[in-house]
Amino acid sequence: MSFTAMLFSCSNNTQEVRDFLASKNLPIGIAKNALHVYKDSGRISSKLITPLLHDFSNRKQHPYNEFPMGVKIINFEGKDSVTITGNYAISYSKTSVSEISGNVVVLNHTEQSKLETERLFWDQNTQYFFSEKAFTLSTVKDTVYGIGFECKEDLSMHLAKKTVGNLITSEK
């Protein structure tokens, strides 16, 4: 009877591994069917749901998270509940700007308004959306079509560019 033991040791430190993965443009982490809950002062402020997350936080200059199979974000900030969905997203950590593309839909459940576009940029610091792509903004009263827009996260205070459609307005 013979017995053989082989022992191996790794001497890489965590930073060396991170640098290696970054140099090969590989994520430091991959999560499948991820649910991330964000809390502020013990209160849930938003949820992020995605079938696949690539974590590139190992990048020194521009760390980011990529959602190649789409993303659903439910935001409970303020008085309105807003849901954002898209087929692809990338979120940059340092700037807090996200790009969401492919069948992007933003729903304000409280006001019953909906924004649809193919590409949307979201500045999470200023809580602002903007795009230069074609869009449809539907409210209870009217629907506006156009190319290019800016608006707050809750779809209020919007600036629509190159628009067509009927708008109901009131003087104040």
Q: Where are the model-predicted features located?
A:
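Mature-chain termini and adjacent capping regions
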Residues: 1-172
